Amino acid sequence: AEEHRDWVMLYQYGNPANPLAHYNGTAVEILEELDEVHAFVAGLGTGGTLMGVGRRLKEHDPNTKIVAAEPMQGELVQGLRSLDDGFIPPIIDLSLLDRKIMVSNRDAIEWTQRLLREEGLFAGVSAGAIAAICARIAGEMDEGNVVFIVPDDGWKYLSSGVYTKPVSELEGVESTIWW
């Protein structure tokens, strides 16, 4: 991109426009629908959704819990990353997070299947990972709401068996790259 003036390098991991788009867009839409957000859960990916929405929700209500869903170290879930693997995207401000919760591939797949079966959402495995953490957070609360964004759909997972096989039949579920 440096050599070609008509090319663009977005670099979502370090581009401040990434969280800004969620701060000015996604978070505003959430607050238009809900007066209160008690917890917001997003995947630990580029950091754009987590930081942009998280910052706006904290400004609206400092008591809102901002939670990152993070795969276990060494496990690869498309769109998510473990900070323990060594890379922290430049746009991530860890001080904004109230919690960072690990999710296994197994839980991510089980929740991906539940989203389809129970809610009719043809979501991807990263959405299942985030939903698993949402359920955990909701289980800790007496009342309130937990918000999350479905960041991917299921098309790229169709040949993996995620939607057709029980988790117990998926070989190497904890060592497979789910993308």
Features from the language model and the residues they span:
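Active-site/ligand-binding loops adjacent to catalytic centers
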Residues: 2-6, 58-125, 140, 161-179
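Active-site/ligand-binding-proximal alpha/beta "capping" segment
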Residues: 7-45, 56, 106-122
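Hydrophobic/aromatic beta-strand patches that form the interior of the parallel beta-sheet core
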Residues: 8-10, 41, 67, 101, ...
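Short, well-ordered alpha-helices that flank and scaffold nucleotide-derived cofactor binding pockets
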Residues: 32, 55, 59, 132-139
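Short glycine/serine/threonine-rich phosphate/pyrophosphate-binding segments
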Residues: 43-53, 126-134, 157
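ATP/nucleoside-binding phosphotransfer catalytic cores, i.e., glycine-rich phosphate-binding loops
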Residues: 115-117, 143-162
